[in-house]
Every structure is written in C-alpha cells, then in structure tokens.
C-alpha cells in the first residue's frame, strides 16, 4: 500500500519533524509513506473574502498537481465526517481489500482547502471541531494512520 500526505507549507519545527519521522519509520512495515509539501501562498494579514478564495485556489492548484487519478483521496476538513479510530481502521482495511492501494491525504493551509480540492476528494475527514495548526495536524494524521494499521494487525497499541 502507498500512503501519501500532501500538505501546504514547510514544516519548520524540529519536534514535529521528529514525530513524523518516527511514525513514518513505524509505518514502513505496512506501507510506503511519502509526504509531499507544496508552497503556501503569501497573503496579507487582513484580507477580503475574495483574497481568501484566491489564496485557496492557488494552493488548491498546487495540491491537485500532486494527486493522480487512481488515488483514493481524503481531504481533512472541519466539516468532514468524524470517525472513531476503529472506524477509520476499518475504512483503510476496506480500501485495501477493494483495490485502493494508493491512498492520499490532503492537509490544506491555514485557510483550508479550495472547492476544487474538496470536490476531488473521495471523502472529507475531520479530526474534531477543534482548530489546530496545520503543522500539528500532520502529526495527528500520521499517528492515526499508524494506529489504524496497528488496529488492523491486532496489536495492543490501541487500547
């Protein structure tokens, strides 16, 4: 299985990089994991709704350029469907069972994702109503992917 995480912006904090590297290493026995970063678009601190949409559109085009047609795509979104870890694990298992060996997760920038990215997504996934930095979301996401594989393998990691 191939897991790809497409993110907007560079990860600067060493502690986030270290956590992601650790989960990538742990996941390597189950799947090939790649993290693709696309540049974030600079925006003024105070901007209009039109400027907000322009930034999301530009970042969205960058995201979409990294996604292939055959990939099953989850887009992280506050308004996405919330799942338990067990439900998420079952979805990953079902995708693998039914021939989806390439799964992509998208984490948008600080403004979210464009309508085009959301439409390309096969599913919108939410990790709760809380707002968190998109850099932290990378760690949360990769840990939950690892947890899903551990649940599916019957490991006591998930208690």
From Swiss-Prot:
<keyword id="KW-0963">Cytoplasm</keyword>
<comment type="subunit">
    <text>Homodimer.</text>
</comment>
<keyword id="KW-0808">Transferase</keyword>
<dbReference type="InterPro" id="IPR029028">
    <property type="entry name" value="Alpha/beta_knot_MTases"/>
</dbReference>
<keyword id="KW-0949">S-adenosyl-L-methionine</keyword>
<dbReference type="Pfam" id="PF02590">
    <property type="entry name" value="SPOUT_MTase"/>
</dbReference>
<keyword id="KW-0698">rRNA processing</keyword>
<comment type="function">
    <text>Specifically methylates the pseudouridine at position 1915 (m3Psi1915) in 23S rRNA.</text>
</comment>
<dbReference type="InterPro" id="IPR029026">
    <property type="entry name" value="tRNA_m1G_MTases_N"/>
</dbReference>
<comment type="similarity">
    <text>Belongs to the RNA methyltransferase RlmH family.</text>
</comment>
<dbReference type="InterPro" id="IPR003742">
    <property type="entry name" value="RlmH-like"/>
</dbReference>
<feature type="binding site">
    <location>
        <begin position="127"/>
        <end position="132"/>
    </location>
    <ligand>
        <name>S-adenosyl-L-methionine</name>
    </ligand>
</feature>
<dbReference type="GO" id="GO:0070038">
    <property type="term" value="F:rRNA (pseudouridine-N3-)-methyltransferase activity"/>
</dbReference>
<feature type="binding site">
    <location>
        <position position="108"/>
    </location>
    <ligand>
        <name>S-adenosyl-L-methionine</name>
    </ligand>
</feature>
<keyword id="KW-0489">Methyltransferase</keyword>
<dbReference type="GO" id="GO:0005737">
    <property type="term" value="C:cytoplasm"/>
</dbReference>
<protein>
    <recommendedName>
        <fullName>Ribosomal RNA large subunit methyltransferase H</fullName>
        <ecNumber>2.1.1.177</ecNumber>
    </recommendedName>
</protein>
């Amino acid at each position: 299985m191939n897991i790809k995480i497409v993110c907007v912006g560079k990860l600067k904090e060493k502690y986030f990089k270290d956590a992601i590297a650790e989960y990538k290493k742990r996941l390597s026995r189950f799947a090939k994991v790649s993290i693709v970063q696309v540049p974030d678009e600079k925006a003024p601190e105070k901007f209009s709704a039109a400027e907000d949409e322009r930034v999301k559109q530009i970042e969205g085009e960058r995201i979409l350029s990294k996604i292939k047609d055959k990939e099953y795509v989850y887009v992280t979104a506050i308004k996405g469907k919330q799942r338990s870890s067990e439900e998420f694990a079952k979805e990953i298992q079902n995708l693998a069972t039914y021939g989806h060996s390439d799964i992509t997760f998208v984490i948008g920038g600080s403004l979210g994702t464009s309508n085009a990215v959301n439409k390309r997504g096969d599913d919108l996934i939410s990790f709760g109503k809380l707002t968190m930095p998109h850099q932290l979301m990378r760690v949360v996401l990769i840990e939950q992917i690892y947890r899903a594989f551990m649940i599916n393998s019957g490991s006591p990691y998930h208690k």
